């Protein structure tokens, strides 16, 4: 029979409403089944979802639906990472309150996500700007404060002059603010810090336990934590060369083996010695100011021109007091790493070598490769920073670098300078405490009060929440809380005198560092229900972009430990499994060239094949447009696809299927009209084949065939079922999709035969069983289509609630084996034969192979040795 085309605009809202009414995705914390917690990184409510969201949330939804079908009690929640600068920017630009802007955006994006058919537990939804959420965050802050994990200090900060706020080092990219793009300035401010460094070793060691994280992410975190073992060495200042009160300069180094290659010392612009010199030298003061204005990110330090200023100070070499070295202030040395001072061995470090060449300082090779020649080994334009053997190093010559390290460490830790050891062994970390103060309104208020008599006073827990005032304006840059007298001015909880609220709010990365815990019991009065949190955590599968490898993921790992220390959870790691998906990318299109060129949106062009080449033309005028490179979707280059357009034209299932099908999930997927059209054709073809055969299938049993014509159908379905299950367990969505395409191709003829009425009972039963398997394995990816097909086969329940089918072992067993065939021990051919073939049958089949006949050239074998199901060897 002929059927109507599948209409997603009718089917998708209908099934979404049925799911919602039945509350089938709401999770019961008391369900006794094994738990599975799947979570995609929650979105910032910018107002619209993008295609990257579609891919991210489609992946998470496949996992959630699959695990639900496998019998797990699945938690799959959704919320909103809702504080941050964009809301304040919108307030300034559009004269709308950040709260109103944010909640309007949430409403729009919620509707978009619901139209995707995601199996989310919306009953647990929250936004981080909800008072109910940030009240519990303030509670956590107070607990961490009491535990000594929060402190306040004066520090040099990265100041974003556009956003008028402080940025963490990680938020400074190439010397610019990560959001605004403004050149970052250095300022001294009193800031709140989380003591993430207390957990540095634990955070590092535990990376080895995260077996289900990408190795790349673990390596990025390892490098960011940056553990090193070295020596802290005191270099005596030569008499008469340093300012009063300074006797030595302490340097931390991981390469004391290279001390005989030392050429100079370099100190940071904020080193106490540099500050003291600045008081008496305007040149030094000006140079230090110049250094402070430069970026402090690694990228900025690596790419900036290396500059230094000779201070006139000399220090004595710790292994030879008669040898004096100059001390420079250098723009590549930071005060917050090590001691803020380095010794430079130019032959072993490229940065030091460039500096030494620039300022005419000595370069002495002290390490050469093991197979090098000491007499001829030199350092030219490239430093040698590898291991090897020591040269030009007096009593260290001939030792390996590790041996030299130990010898120097032994000597200097035993030597004295002013009744203290010249050196001590030390472990150092690159990781710094997390500065969480932000000078903005739209964030979680820090729950402390400043009293002239009592100092810093935590807000009593019974007085929480410290709510943001609604009556603020954004007429001028900066923090409106500083200008709000009735909110800012309060009585001290301790003495009752006039006091002031803290007007800084928390870094938004705090909000996203514990939200996964709140989802486990979002109705709780305290931040967590520890028993429930301990049941659900860690998150079994976390999905998000690799751009969060350091910031969000490291902060979350710290926060789980902090919550463990304060009694809110018993676990240490937040995420058991981590998957970092690739981006959705698209061709770029440009009209004209040079400064007058304009980017053109994909919706405004048509692409044609002209003489075998792809060419693009404007829809409006027919003008030719240049097809550019495939790039990350961006508004600036207009190569964006609006998910609403795709969902409206093709439906959610087609969009979901395409973003899952076209590329391995950890790689970028190239969006193409041909690709989405192909997925849509598959949807229509599947619906047509199933619906046309439905009248016959509906009256049949669902039974796989063990023999006869239906056996091949059953084998194909059950082998696909087995393989797709294995693919989904490995998140290999694209492989699962490819197998689903193959299975539909296999079932096309049998379904057509069933629809025509020319099939016997056992064949129809086998086809029904195979079709139900097909419907169930597409259900995690295309849930609406699956429900429609499931219903048309006569099922009263929903496929979203059906158990995952079980493959029959006898139908997936391989009935043939491939055996290598050797002649006198050398492989000449391969034989494919039935697994149960006897020795005589194998021998005869081998002799019938063309390759064997050609190799034997008429000779009669002396014997044929058959190792059953393994190998055949012919002896001639």
Curated annotation (Swiss-Prot):
Gene Ontology process terms (BP): leucyl-tRNA aminoacylation
GO MF assignments: aminoacyl-tRNA deacylase activity; ATP binding; leucine-tRNA ligase activity
Residues passing through the membrane, by range: none
Uppermost EC category: ligase
Gene3D superfamilies from the UniProt entry: 2.20.28.290, 3.10.20.590, HUPs, Isoleucyl-tRNA Synthetase, Domain 1, Valyl/Leucyl/Isoleucyl-tRNA synthetase, editing domain
PROSITE patterns: AA_TRNA_LIGASE_I
Sequence positions that bind ATP: 635
Top-level taxon in the UniProt lineage: Bacteria
Cellular component per GO, a single term: cytosol
Intracellular or extracellular location(s): Cytoplasm
EC number(s) per entry: 6.1.1.4
Alphabetic keyword roster: Aminoacyl-tRNA synthetase, ATP-binding, Cytoplasm, Ligase, Nucleotide-binding, Protein biosynthesis
Catalytic activity: tRNA(Leu) + L-leucine + ATP = L-leucyl-tRNA(Leu) + AMP + diphosphate
InterPro entries: aa-tRNA-synth_I_CS (IPR001412), aa-tRNA-synth_Ia (IPR002300), Leu-tRNA-ligase (IPR002302), Leu_tRNA-synth_edit (IPR025709), M/V/L/I-tRNA-synth_anticd-bd (IPR013155), Methionyl/Leucyl_tRNA_Synth (IPR015413), Rossmann-like_a/b/a_fold (IPR014729), tRNAsynth_Ia_anticodon-bd (IPR009080)
Position of sequence motif 'HIGH' region: 43-53
Sequence motif 'KMSKS' region, residues: 632-636
Family assignment from sequence similarity: Belongs to the class-I aminoacyl-tRNA synthetase family.
Stored HAMAP family: Leu_tRNA_synth_B
UniProt xrefs under NCBIfam families: leuS_bact (TIGR00396)
PANTHER family: LEUCINE--TRNA LIGASE, MITOCHONDRIAL, LEUCYL-TRNA SYNTHETASE
Name by which UniProt lists this protein: Leucine--tRNA ligase
């Amino acid at each position: 029979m002929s059927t109507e085309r599948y209409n997603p605009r009718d089917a998708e809202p209908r099934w979404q409403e049925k799911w919602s009414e039945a509350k089938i995705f709401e999770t019961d914390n008391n369900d006794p089944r094994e738990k599975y917690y799947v979570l995609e990184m929650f979105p910032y409510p910018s107002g619209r979802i993008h295609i990257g969201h579609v891919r991210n949330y489609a992946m998470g939804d496949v996992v959630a639906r699959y695990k639900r079908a496998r019998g797990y009690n699945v938690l799959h929640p959704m919320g909103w990472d809702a504080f941050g600068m964009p809301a304040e920017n919108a307030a300034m630009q559009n004269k709308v309150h950040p709260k109103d802007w944010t909640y309007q955006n949430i409403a729009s994006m919620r509707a978009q996500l619901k139209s995707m058919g995601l199996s989310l537990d919306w009953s647990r939804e929250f936004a981080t700007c909800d008072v109910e959420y940030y009240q519990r965050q303030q509670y956590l802050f107070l607990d961490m404060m009491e535990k000594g994990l929060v402190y306040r200090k004066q520090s040099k900060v990265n100041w974003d002059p556009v956003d008028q706020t402080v940025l963490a080092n990680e938020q400074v990219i190439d010397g610019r603010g990560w959001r605004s793009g403004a050149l970052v300035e250095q300022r001294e401010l009193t800031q709140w810090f989380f003591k993430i460094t207390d957990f540095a070793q634990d955070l590092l060691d535990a990376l080895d336990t995260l077996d289900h994280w990408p190795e790349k992410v673990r390596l990025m975190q390892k490098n960011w934590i940056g553990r090193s073992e070295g020596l802290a060495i005191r270099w005596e200042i030569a008499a008469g060369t340093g300012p009063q009160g300074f006797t030595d300069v302490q340097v931390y180094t991981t390469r004391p083996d290279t001390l005989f290659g030392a050429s100079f010392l370099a100190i940071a612009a904020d080193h106490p010695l540099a500050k003291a010199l600045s008081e008496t030298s305007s040149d030094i003061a000006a140079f230090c100011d110049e250094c402070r204005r430069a970026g402090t990110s690694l990228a900025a330090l690596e790419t900036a021109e290396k500059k230094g200023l000779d201070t006139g100070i000399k220090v004595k070499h710790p292994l030879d007091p008669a040898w004096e070295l100059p001390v420079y202030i250098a723009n590549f040395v930071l005060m917050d790493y090590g001691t803020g001072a380095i010794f430079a061995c130019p032959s072993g470090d490229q940065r030091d070598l460039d500096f030494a060449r620039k300022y005419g300082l000595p370069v002495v090779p002290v390490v050469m490769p093991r197979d090098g020649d000491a007499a001829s080994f030199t350092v030219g334009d490239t430093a040698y920073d590898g291991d090897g053997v020591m040269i030009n190093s007096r009593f260290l010559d001939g030792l390996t670098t590790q041996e030299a390290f130990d010898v120097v460490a032994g000597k200097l830790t035993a030597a004295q300078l002013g009744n203290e050891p010249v050196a001590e062994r030390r472990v150092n970390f690159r990781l710094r405490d997390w500065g969480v103060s932000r000078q903005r309104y739209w964030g979680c208020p820090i729950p402390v009060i400043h009293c002239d008599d009592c100092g810093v006073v935590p807000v009593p827990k019974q007085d929480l929440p410290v709510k943001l005032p609604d009556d603020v304006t954004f007429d001028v840059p900066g923090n409106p809380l500083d200008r709000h007298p009735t909110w800012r001015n309060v009585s001290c909880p301790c003495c009752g005198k006039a006091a002031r609220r803290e007007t800084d709010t928390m870094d938004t990365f705090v909000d996203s560092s514990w939200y996964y815990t709140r989802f486990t019991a979002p109705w709780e009065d305290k931040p967590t229900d520890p028993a429930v949190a301990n049941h659900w955590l860690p998150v079994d599968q976390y999905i998000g972009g690799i751009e969060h490898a350091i910031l969000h993921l490291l902060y979350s790992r710290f926060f789980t430990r902090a919550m463990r220390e304060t009694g809110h959870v018993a676990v240490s790691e937040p995420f058991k499994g981590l998957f970092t998906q690739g981006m959705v990318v698209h061709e770029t299109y440009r009209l004209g060239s040079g400064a007058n060129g304009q980017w053109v949106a994909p919706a405004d062009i048509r692409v044609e094949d002209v003489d075998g080449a792809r060419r693009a033309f404007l829809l409006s005028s027919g003008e030719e447009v240049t097809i550019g490179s495939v790039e990350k979707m961006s508004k600036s280059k207009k190569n964006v696809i609006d998910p609403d357009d795709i969902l409206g034209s093709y439906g959610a299932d087609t969009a979901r299927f395409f973003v899952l099908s076209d590329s391995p999930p950890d790689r970028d997927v190239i969006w193409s009209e041909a690709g989405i059209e192909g997925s849509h054709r598959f949807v229509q073809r599947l619906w047509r084949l199933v619906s046309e055969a439905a009248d016959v299938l509906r009256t049949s049993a669902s039974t796989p065939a063990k023999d006869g014509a239906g056996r091949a159908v059953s084998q194909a379905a059950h082998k696909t079922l087995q393989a797709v299950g294995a693919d989904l367990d490995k998140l290999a969505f694209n492989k699962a999709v490819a197998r689903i395409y193959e299975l539909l191709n296999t079932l096309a003829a049998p379904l057509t035969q069933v629809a025509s009425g020319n099939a016997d009972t056992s064949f129809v039963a086998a086809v029904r069983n195979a079709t139900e398997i097909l419907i169930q394995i597409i259900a995690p990816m295309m849930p609406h289509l699956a429900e429609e097909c499931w219903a048309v086969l006569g099922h009263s329940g929903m496929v979203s609630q059906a158990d995952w089918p079980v493959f029959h072992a006898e139908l997936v067993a391989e009935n043939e084996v491939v055996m290598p065939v050797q002649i006198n021990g050398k492989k000449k051919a391969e034989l494919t034969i039935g697994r149960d073939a006897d020795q005589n049958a194998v021998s005869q089949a081998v002799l019938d192979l063309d390759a064997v006949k050609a190799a034997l050239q008429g000779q009669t074998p002396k014997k044929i040795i058959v190792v059953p199901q393994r190998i055949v060897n012919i002896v001639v």
